[in-house]
Design a protein with these regions (language model features):
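Membrane-interface interhelical linkers
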Residues: 1-26, 56-82, 131, 198-239, ...
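Glycine-/small-residue-enriched transmembrane alpha-helix faces in small-molecule transporters
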Residues: 2-46, 153-178, 318-328
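Hydrophobic/small/kink-forming positions within alpha-helical transmembrane segments
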Residues: 25-30, 60, 84, 88-92, ...
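Juxtamembrane C-cap of transmembrane helices in multi-pass membrane transport proteins
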Residues: 29-42, 47-50, 92-103, 109, ...
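Hydrophobic/aromatic residues within transmembrane alpha-helices
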Residues: 38, 47, 97, 103, ...
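Helix-helix packing/entry segments at the starts of transmembrane helices
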Residues: 107-112, 179-195, 246-280
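C-terminal transmembrane-helix exit sites in multi-pass transporters
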Residues: 113-138, 273-292
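Hydrophobic transmembrane alpha-helices of multi-pass small-molecule transport proteins
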Residues: 132-149, 290-309
Length: 328
């Protein structure tokens, strides 16, 4: 029997969609903050391998509930694989410096992705970039410099690493828009989980076989340690991360199926506020006033970009994929 949660809604329900969006974003931001908190006890490669294994199991279970295992295989394999590789690079850059910077700085760097979409949409998709989107690009870039401020006393170039995550996420969006618009969300999720599992396995095996210099391991252990000791409790923590990821994605996808994405997508930038809140609760850190201003400028730039995109082509993205932010 097909699970009713996957049935497409028969009518728009904006308030329900808003609640689903807020709940989904809060779970995704909590997952990201908890991964940073747990980073000293694991490695990126171990996290990717085990968490993505749980994601694959959950995806298989959802396919069984939703109508069949055929939903797990994409119609066009290689674009889906390319998207998975881009998202793996995004995750590496997003979490790679998690022990050196705050969770708010991680989120700020990632949420520059609408600016990269604006830069790449012309040469990649042949879209015309108007004055509004150019203005949003300048505003967002200025906000990024304010929020991250890597050149201040005590600043670090690690603060710029999540901006690379924003670039790779933008590339993923363009691949999704051009080649994967008709794919099943479960197929896309399954392929991403498979790519994450393979990259996690490759990184762990490679770094165990060819040890990184000790100075690198001490400076960035989350990346340059292949496979630290694994406890049963750690596996349980990874399962919780996977569950948060799955539930958050389900609520976000359902939100965009239940209301018009033209007004929901800008609200997705509340992720930055949730991340700041979790940073305060878990790490007792709070963004400085200039960082708040920079985050607001990035959010404003993203909102302008989203609104102009909807005005240009209201059907430019499938409902379940129209939102902002990292979803894997």
């Amino acid at each position: 029997m097909k699970f009713s949660f996957f049935d497409r809604p028969s009518e728009d329900r904006p308030m329900l969609a808003l609640c689903l969006l807020f709940f989904g974003v809060s779970l995704m931001s909590l997952q990201d903050s908890l991964i940073k908190l747990f980073a000293p006890h694991t490695s990126f490669w171990q996290l990717q391998l085990i968490r993505s294994s749980f994601n694959m199991l959950f995806a298989i279970g959802l396919a069984a509930l939703a109508g069949g295992f055929h939903l797990l295989w994409p119609r066009r394999l290689w674009p889906a694989v390319a998207r998975g590789v881009l998202l793996a690079a995004c995750m590496l850059c997003f979490f790679g410096a998690s022990q050196q910077i705050t969770v708010a700085q991680m989120a700020t760097g990632l949420y520059t992705y609408p600016l990269f979409i604006t830069l790449l949409a012309g040469p990649v998709l042949g879209e015309r970039i108007g004055s509004w989107r150019i203005g949003a690009l300048v505003l967002g870039a200025a906000g990024c410099l304010l929020a991250l401020d890597p050149f201040a006393d005590g600043g670090s170039y690690f603060q710029l690493v999540p901006v690379l995550a924003g670039f790779f996420y933008a590339c993923n969006v363009l691949v999704l828009r051009r080649y994967c618009r008709t794919e099943s969300p479960l197929a896309l999720a399954f392929v991403v989980a498979l790519i994450f599992m393979l990259t996690g396995l490759g990184g762990a095996v490679g770094l165990e076989a060819f040890k990184a210099p000790a100075s690198w391991q001490q400076a960035v252990p989350f990346i340059f340690v292949g496979w630290p000791p694994l406890a049963i409790g750690t596996v349980g923590v990874f399962a919780c991360f996977s569950a948060l990821n799955l539930i958050g994605n389900l609520f976000l996808s359902r939100a965009y199926q239940t209301a018009d994405s033209s007004w929901l997508a800008p609200l997705d930038f509340i992720y930055l506020l949730f991340v700041a809140m979790w940073g305060r609760v878990l790490f007792e850190s709070w963004p400085a006033p200039l960082a708040w201003l920079g985050m607001a400028m990035i959010a404003a730039a993203g909102i302008v970009t989203a609104m102009r995109e909807q005005r240009r082509d209201p059907s430019s993205a499938p409902p379940a994929q129209a939102g902002s932010g990292r979803r894997e």
